[in-house]
Amino acid sequence: MGVRAQQKEKTRRSLVEAAFSQLSAERSFASLSLREVAREAVIAPTSFYRHFRDVDELGLTMVDESGLMLRQLMRQARQRIAKGGSVIRTSVSTFMEFIGNNPNAFRLLLRERSGTSAAFRAAVAREIQHFIAELADYLELENHMPRAFTEAQAEAMVTIVFSAGAEALDVGVEQRRQLEERLVLQLRMISKGAYYWYRREQEKTAIIPGNVKDE
C-alpha cells in the first residue's frame, strides 16, 4: 500500500472512530451531522466525501465493523474454550467484555436494529444472522445435532444475549455481574432443553407412529 493510500485509510479510520466517539446513551447515530464528525476527525467537511458517499454510508460501515468486532471476539473465545473451560461462561464473559470495551458499537447495533432506516435494519439483521450462523456451526460440530436444532438453539441464545447486553449498558459493576450469572443460567437452560428435545425426537423415531402423544 502506497503512502497516499495509507493516509487515505488513516483518515477514513479517523472518521469512523470520530462517529463512534460521539454516540452515547443519550445520542443516536441519526443525530450526528457530517460537520460534527469531520470536526472530531480533524478534517475539512468537504474532505468527508473522499471517503464516504454520505453519512448513511459511514453508518453502514460502522454497523459492519461492530458486527465483525463482536464475531471476531467470540471466535477468540471459542479458541480459549478449546484449551479448556466452560463454553457458556467463557462466551458470556467475552460478550460482556465486548460491551464494556465497545459500548457505542453495541448501542449502534441495538438502536439501528429497529430504527427508521430500512438499509440500517437490513445491515444489522445481516450481522445478527452471521452471528447466529457461526454459533450454529460451532454447536453442530460440538454437539453432533442436526442443523435445524443447532440453528434454533443459536437463534434463541443470540436473542437472549442481545437482550441482556441492552441491560448491561446501563448498570453498574455489581449489577452487571449479577446479570452475567443470570445469563449463564439462561443459556445453560436453553442448551439442556435443546439437547433434551433432540433426544426426545430421536426416541420418537424408534416408536411406532401413533403411540406417542405430542406435547
Swiss-Prot record:
Record GO biological process: fatty acid biosynthetic process; negative regulation of fatty acid biosynthetic process
Molecular function GO labels: DNA binding; DNA-binding transcription factor activity
Intracellular or extracellular location(s): Cytoplasm
Main location: cytoplasm
NCBIfam families in the record: PRK11202.1
Subunit structure: Homodimer.
Identification of the protein by name: HTH-type transcriptional repressor FabR
Gene giving rise to this polypeptide: fabR
